[in-house]
């Protein structure tokens, strides 16, 4: 008789709204390790929440937070449909005994003592502080989307970009802590663990291990403390002085929750400071503790998180045996021995290579780990992850009380019924983006642009009038009138449009909507070879290609990263807005929003077509798995939005009065003087006309054979805004431009400007990320694509009789 086993149930098969217990996690390599680090470990209760509108990916809830993963990856996770155990955390009883329950049911934890308790972990009489002139270096580390960059801005007075989707910080940023001269804090990319799954995690790990800061400020989201403490445990293993900033405590209290901060300190062996970075609460005490532990080099009191009696002591014995075997190697490699042991035990090959163990030592370590696997009943990676989450569960049970559902989560669920609903998500996304364009280009931005344009024109007339009254040289008058006010002034008038667009994009970003867009669009993007996470750099690309290229570092796959970088320039950056607005106002004044929206969607469509070509040629294969945490919706912070708008306005003004000003002056000079350096009466006889004559034939097939147009396009290589200033200088007036170009030629020009190569700063960013060869190929390819599309538009229009 043949024994036929019943088919296994996978997470993919779990009905929505149902819960089950994970029994095993499939996959291999860094992907499987990432699953484990995100909490998808055996014996964990998981609930299927919803699927994306296109049916994939799947949203699940575990450990009191929510993740998204594709159905193909969910199929690798075996579950058993057993009821999840319900436990009442003892912390509720402790809090009630400590402070009582206030009317209304809000638990009141003991007040957290102020600074002065920091020295209780060590006897100061046996310690020697660092010299007063020693520079105290700190690493600011934490999960993505935990308020880390907000805290960095608060500590340093900097105004780094703050957003409510994973992956805002993509490079290290340094700053001084307030008025403390000999301090330096580094804002590191947000990570979930010290396993190098993505390039940002590798950057953070290499910094912490290589540069060894004097102290670590670990910021933890108190509303999602279970998820965040997983990284905390690995940071403690680095044996570096450390303080934990328990952020968003205001939200915890507002929801009727609480944290026994003093008990949490005892459990972790480091100072814990409750703060609210958004409200600037608790940061003074945090700074005092951080300076204290760094100056006295107070190392974490606890690094051992597994009990000797837990599961027969298998993991405990394994880790301590490995520590004994590798102690000398870890010291020579400059690596904390506990960290090295736990990483070896979970199978981290990078750490194993750095330790340089000989063959006998490798075999001894492997024997210890194999024995642990047999005793524990789990593979090595799952056993270590289980050890960490078991400790976190014990700590949270003893210190944390949460409501059944926070107000933020309930609100997010209601909003998501529309914004991620099966039939409403795509229409909502299209509607939101069209509303942004309409308000920017037809209502708010257009109104303030007209006001500023009138003001600049009036100022220009006033200054020229003064120069004429003073009988200033005519050539100098031309420089001021045509070069400065005609060129730079024409660009400045578009500042309101750029600020307005960034205002709306920052609202969407801060609120948490961008993460939902990634969730909704993942299946669609996968068809062109990308991951849903690629939507984040691409959406940033609508603002500026430089940070968009940098944001691609958050992608764990080199294939996805390269493909995203090459496609990002097709997302029209804000520097091109003045070109669109200028030409649209001149040739299509009644159809501004339609033309603008059409250009943006055309850029996306061309990018999709190029992606399909690249997917089938240079970038064959599948996109990496989509594992992402969905943050709750939050009200955008007025301070963050204000800082972002000021940064963008300041950057635009700096470019206007540096690169664009210089380009305008050069263009004016070349257009005013002939080859004999005498002023020419006809600009067609100028130096510039001779130079531009070489490239003009390239644009003749689409009706753009005027040398002034090719000159403007060449100036756009320096800065896209220079196209407008150059046209303004060379044509002198909008009427002259309209007389020189047909409407169809103007449309072809718009399409070419949309698609041709980005500015030199963006090209330099691509070169830094991918190398010079890739950057050069991108420039050539985009120019070819732009020419073909522009000519196609012109040819189609001419065939239909619109020429």
Report residues per predicted region.
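Transmembrane helix-loop junctions at the membrane interface of multipass transporters and ion channels
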Residues: 570, 574-597, 761-771, 792-803
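Conserved G1/Walker A P-loop phosphate-binding module
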Residues: 110-193
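Alpha-helical transmembrane helix bundles of large polytopic membrane transport and channel proteins
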Residues: 243, 253-404
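Core alpha-helical transmembrane segments of integral membrane proteins
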Residues: 419-519
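Hydrophobic core segments of alpha-helical transmembrane domains in multi-pass membrane transport
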Residues: 428-439, 501-506, 584-586, 599-613, ...
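Extended, low-charge hydrophobic alpha-helical regions
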Residues: 375, 382-383, 402, 443-483, ...
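Juxtamembrane inter-helical linkers in multi-pass membrane proteins
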Residues: 458-462, 515-545, 620-644
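Conserved C-terminal guanine-recognition region of P-loop GTPase G domains, centered on the G4
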Residues: 180, 203-272, 579
């Amino acid at each position: 008789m043949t024994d036929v086993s019943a088919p296994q149930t996978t997470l993919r098969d779990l009905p929505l709204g149902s819960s089950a217990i994970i029994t095993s996690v499939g996959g291999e390599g860094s992907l499987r390790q990432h699953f484990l680090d995100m909490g998808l470990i055996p014996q964990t209760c998981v609930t299927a929440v919803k699927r994306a509108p296109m049916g994939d990916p799947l949203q699940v809830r575990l450990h009191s937070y929510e993740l998204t993963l594709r159905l193909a990856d969910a199929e690798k996770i075996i579950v058993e449909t057993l009821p999840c155990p319900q436990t009442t955390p003892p912390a509720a009883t402790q809090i009630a005994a400590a402070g009582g329950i206030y009317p209304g049911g809000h638990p009141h934890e003991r007040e957290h003592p102020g600074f002065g308790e920091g020295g209780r972990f060590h006897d100061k009489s046996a310690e020697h502080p660092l010299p007063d002139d020693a520079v105290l270096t700190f690493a600011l580390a934490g999960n993505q989307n935990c308020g880390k960059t907000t805290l960095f801005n608060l500590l340093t007075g900097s105004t780094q970009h703050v957003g409510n989707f994973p992956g805002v910080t993509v490079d290290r940023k340094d700053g001084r802590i307030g008025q403390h001269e000999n301090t330096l804090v580094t804002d590191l990319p947000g990570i979930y663990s010290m396993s190098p799954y993505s390039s940002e995690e590798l950057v953070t790990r290499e910094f912490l291990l290589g540069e060894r800061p004097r102290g670590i400020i670990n910021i933890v989201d108190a509303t999602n403390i279970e998820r965040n403490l997983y990284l905390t445990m690995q940071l403690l293993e680095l044996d570096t002085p450390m303080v934990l900033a328990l952020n968003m405590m205001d939200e915890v209290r507002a929801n009727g929750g609480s944290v026994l901060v003093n008990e949490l300190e005892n459990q972790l062996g480091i100072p814990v400071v409750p703060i609210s970075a958004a409200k600037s609460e608790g940061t003074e005490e945090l700074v005092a503790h951080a300076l204290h532990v760094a100056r006295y080099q107070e190392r974490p009191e606890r690094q051992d998180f597994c009990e000797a009696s837990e599961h027969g002591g298998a993991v405990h014995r394994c880790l301590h045996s490995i520590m004994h075997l590798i102690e000398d190697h870890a010291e020579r490699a400059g690596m904390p021995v506990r960290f090295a042991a736990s990483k070896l035990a979970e199978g981290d090959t990078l750490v194993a290579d750095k330790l340089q163990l000989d063959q006998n030592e490798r075999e001894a370590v492997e024997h210890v780990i194999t024995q642990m696997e047999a005793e524990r009943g789990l593979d090595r990676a799952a056993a270590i992850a289980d050890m960490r989450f078991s400790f976190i569960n014990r700590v949270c049970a003893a210190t944390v009380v949460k409501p059944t559902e926070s107000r933020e989560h309930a609100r997010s669920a209601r909003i998501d019924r529309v914004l991620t609903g099966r039939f409403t998500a795509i229409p909502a996304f299209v509607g939101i983006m069209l509303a942004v364009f309409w308000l920017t280009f037809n209502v708010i931005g257009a109104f303030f642009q007209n006001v500023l344009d009138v003001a600049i024109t009036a100022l220009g007339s006033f200054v020229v009038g003064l120069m004429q009254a003073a009988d200033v040289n005519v050539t100098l008058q031309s420089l001021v009138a045509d070069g400065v006010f005609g060129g730079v002034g024409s660009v400045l008038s578009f500042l309101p449009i750029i600020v307005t667009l960034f205002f709306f994009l920052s609202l969407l970003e801060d609120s948490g909507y961008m993460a939902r867009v990634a969730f909704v669009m993942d299946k669609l993007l996968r068809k062109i070879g990308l991951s849903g996470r690629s939507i984040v750099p691409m959406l940033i690309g609508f603002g500026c290609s430089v940070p968009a290229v940098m944001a691609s570092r958050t992608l764990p796959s080199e294939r996805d990263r390269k493909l995203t970088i090459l496609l990002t320039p097709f997302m029209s950056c804000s520097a091109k807005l003045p070109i669109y607005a200028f030409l649209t106002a001149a040739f299509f004044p009644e159809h501004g929003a339609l033309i603008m929206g059409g250009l943006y969607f055309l850029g996306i469509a061309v990018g999709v077509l190029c992606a399909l070509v690249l997917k089938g040629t240079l970038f064959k294969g599948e996109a990496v798995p989509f594992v992402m945490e969905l943050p709750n919706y939050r009200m955008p912070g007025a301070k963050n939005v204000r800082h972002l708008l000021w940064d963008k306005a300041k950057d635009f003004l700096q470019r206007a009065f540096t690169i664009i000003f210089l380009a305008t002056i050069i263009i004016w000079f070349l257009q005013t003087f002939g080859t004999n350096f005498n002023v020419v009466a006809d600009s067609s006889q100028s130096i510039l006309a001779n130079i531009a004559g070489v490239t003009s034939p390239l644009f003749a097939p689409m009706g753009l054979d005027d040398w002034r147009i090719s000159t403007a396009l060449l100036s756009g290589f320096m800065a896209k805004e220079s196209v407008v200033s150059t046209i303004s200088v060379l044509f002198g007036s909008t009427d002259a431009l309209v007389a020189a170009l047909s409407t169809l030629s103007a449309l072809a020009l718009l399409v070419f400007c949309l698609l041709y190569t980005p500015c030199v700063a963006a090209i330099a960013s691509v070169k830094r990320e991918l190398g010079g060869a890739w950057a050069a190929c991108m420039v050539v390819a985009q120019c070819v694509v732009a020419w073909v599309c522009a000519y196609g538009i012109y040819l189609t229009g001419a065939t239909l009789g619109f020429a």
